[in-house]
Amino acid sequence: MRRGRNQSAVIIISTFPNKESIIQNVNDLIIEKKLCACISLVPIRSFYSWSNKLEDHEEIMVLMKTTKSLATKLKLEIARLHPYDVPEIIEVKMNDVSKSYLKWMIDSIKS
């Protein structure tokens, strides 16, 4: 699919057990495969039910900024690399993105 200037931007959100589990793949996702323009890591504390038990874990929320045309490839790559049995992989459309930021994103992920 062509990556033109008329792209819409999305954020792919996922959680990982620690920084090391994502940092080892950042260079590959951004530089080599050019699947996203930027990855932000945010420390969080997650509470969730797993096997009928309440879980409480510190995790890293990962925000990956990319274009709609690359979102599916990026989500497949995250699923392939992810250490969890059931990874959280969410796509959110970015609204009201500045033209300069969108241009930078598109330029950053051009082949």
Model-derived regions: residue spans:
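Positively charged, small/polar-rich N-terminal and surface patches that mediate targeting and assembly
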Residues: 1-111
